[in-house]
A protein has these predicted regions:
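Flavin (primarily FAD) cofactor-binding/catalytic cores of flavoenzymes
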Residues: 2-77, 82, 125-246, 252-484
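Core mature regions of organelle-targeted
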Residues: 80-90
């Protein structure tokens, strides 16, 4: 799991018993209230959640607490490797404060602190600065197991299309299809668009000469060699430190900015309630706030920077954008305003672009999805192409239509991934915001399911005639005699 000592299985079992009692006390689970749907193509799930990382798991738990149990979570990765933590994330620890409680829904026994303390002891928690990446993944594995969440692994979604009667058809890479009334895209930081690879790189380098930080990288093949990293955000330093720790000879980080990023606006958001109250802002206020947010590169954590900078093979080049790249004699040649460099391999820490038109699973629906650029008018000097490409979401993370005629196509489709940033702030894919975002999403899904069936439910309610009171008056003689 990590360099922490072995798990205290007795304490963990006691915690799980406490959790079971807490769940029972707050009546977390119960029979479904939703009305079953039938479809000629097969079983109809009330909700299919695409993505089995922290967002998908927590969404599933929230729905079960609302007594919506006809659900299924899908993840393209093998069991235990959902999300980025054991696939491409290379930071040593999470970047968020250890005391956050993002996915526990207020249940003390489900918090990361309760689990960590049960596993490793209170002293280990007190000594902890931030939660190690691998330990966080172990918490998520436990979360899935202890809550018995319905997750199907090795299931990659390739398409989402309307199947009629308020149902979506969810196509999988293996040829199977599923049906669902609601589909939640809990697809992480990249799930609302794609990782950005600059055209200069795509057009001038062979594919084997570079990788994005979001991709697997064979660092063993780079032992003793020279690697260049384009970009100066947190992931650049995560990858630099990780590569050097794996035996890479030199790592050079190149930043366009002339100074290291020092301000992390997320910390301000956490302090003043920005994460919880952001959705109440007007569109223009959101636009300006997120323009400021996107102007910052998230800085590395201090410990990650210090680790990376302590390696003899580490170099940092400020004010050094890549003006040209070329592939010559098996090496990547990088030209900056100041010098020329030769590398055996380069890594791109160039961020991502959120745009539903880039998602292959949304190919049939993306033309009908409203974007911020379609909906919000800003003065010409304030327009931001990155913001304009984000989907314009409703208050419960639901996609909204570009035209009123498109409403039925999108009704029931939710974007609980990083593309929600502009509409709803730090929420999905951001541990700092999930505590507030999850109830909003779950309530919105439950409301839709209820309102979709309101005519039938109201008719049943009006016709309801099940008698509960069984007393009689005048009282029968037998009852009077028994009372005497």
């Amino acid at each position: 799991m990590s360099d922490l000592h072995a798990v205290d299985t007795v304490a963990l079992a006691a915690l799980e018993a406490d959790l079971a009692q807490q769940l029972a006390l707050v009546d977390s689970f119960g029979p479904d209230w939703t009305r079953p749907r039938t479809h000629p193509e097969g079983h109809v799930h009330d909700v299919v959640i695409v993505g089995g990382g922290q967002s998908g798991l927590a969404t599933a738990f929230g729905l079960k607490r609302e007594r919506i149990n006809n659900i299924l979570v899908l993840d393209e990765n093998p069991e235990g490797f959902e999300g980025p933590w054991e696939t491409y994330a290379r930071m040593i620890t999470l970047r968020t404060p250890k005391g956050l409680t993002p996915i526990d829904y207020g249940l003390p026994a489900l918090t990361p602190q309760a689990w960590f303390t049960a596993c490793f002891g209170a002293a280990a928690w007190d000594a902890l600065d931030k939660i190690p990446r691998g330990v966080w993944m172990e918490y998520l594995r436990w979360y899935r197991r202890v809550l018995n969440l319905p997750l199907r692994n090795d299931a990659r979604v390739t398409g989402i299309t309307p199947a009629g009667d308020g149902v979506y058809r969810v196509a999988l890479a293996d040829g199977a299809t599923l049906l669902a009334r609601k589909v939640v895209l809990a697809t992480g930081i990249q799930g609302g668009g794609e990782w950005h690879t600059p055209a200069m790189i795509r057009e001038n380098l062979p594919r084997h000469a570079y990788a994005h930080t979001s991709e697997p990288i064979d660092l063993a093949a780079l032992e003793g060699k020279r690697v260049g990293i384009l970009g100066g955000g947190a992931s650049a330093f995560d990858n630099a430190n990780h590569a050097l720790a794996q035996g890479v000879g030199e790592v050079h980080v190149f930043m366009r900015r002339k100074a290291l990023p020092r301000i992390n606006p997320i910390r301000f958001m956490e302090r003043v309630g920005f994460t919880a109250r952001y959705p109440a802002l007007s569109d223009a206020e959101k636009y300006r706030a997120m323009a400021a947010f996107l102007s910052h590169n998230q800085p590395p954590t201090n410990d990650t920077f210090n680790r990376a900078a302590s390696w003899p093979g580490f170099a940092l080049h400020l004010g050094s954008p890549w003006n040209e790249v070329a592939h010559e004699d098996g090496q990547v040649i990088v030209t900056t305003p100041h010098d020329r460099f030769a590398f055996d391999f380069v890594i791109l820490s160039t961020g991502l672009i959120s745009d539903p038109r880039l998602r292959p699973e949304l190919a049939a629906l993306a033309p009908h999805i409203a974007l911020w650029g379609d909906v919000v008018a800003m003065p010409e000097g304030e327009r931001n192409a990155l913001i304009d490409a984000h989907p314009y979401l409703g208050p419960a993370f639901e996609f909204t239509p570009r035209a009123p005629a498109d409403a039925a196509l999108l009704h029931g489709l939710f974007a609980f991934n990083y593309s929600a940033l502009i509409s709803l702030g730090l929420s999905a894919s951001a541990l700092s915001g999930m505590k507030n975002a999850l109830p909003r999403l779950v309530r919105g899904i439950a409301d839709q399911l209820f309102l979709d069936d309101r005519e039938a439910l109201l008719a049943q309610f009006i016709a309801y005639d099940e008698e509960e009171f069984v007393g009689e008056w005048p009282r029968p003689a037998s009852a009077v005699e028994a009372a005497a």
